């Protein structure tokens, strides 16, 4: 059985190597940080695609600087593998309950997320 993350960045032509693997989660990151099961799943993806970088994308209620959390895992003596979580801010309120305002705020959050993701890759 083959396993695949949600996104692969820099996938080689033979599909055996990716510069980075990215996986989206639909549950918010809790105060404890990286979930153990999510970490194991990401490590499996990273080993499958011989990648040193893994990114877990989480929804985030608050637009703050804590949306980026890094944790490094050294699996081999000569190879530094890391997993980094990146929060995508989901607006929780809309001005006067207007859908258009939510869409505008969500577009800003998406643009900020894309910028932070590009900075990581």
Q: Regions from the language model: what does each represent?
A:
Residues 1-121:
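Catalytic core segments in nucleotide and nucleic-acid processing enzymes
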């Amino acid at each position: 059985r083959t396993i695949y993350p949600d996104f692969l960045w820099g996938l080689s032509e033979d599909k055996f190597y990716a510069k980075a693997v990215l996986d989206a989660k639909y549950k918010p990151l809790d105060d404890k940080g990286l979930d153990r099961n999510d970490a194991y799943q990401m490590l499996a993806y990273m080993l499958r695609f011989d990648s040193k970088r893994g990114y877990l994308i989480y929804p985030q209620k608050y637009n703050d600087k804590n949306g980026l959390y890094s944790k490094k895992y050294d699996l081999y003596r000569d190879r530094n593998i890391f997993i980094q979580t990146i929060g995508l801010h989901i607006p929780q309120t809309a001005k006067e309950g207007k859908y258009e305002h939510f869409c505008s705020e969500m577009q800003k959050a998406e643009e900020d997320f894309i910028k932070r993701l590009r900075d990581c890759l």
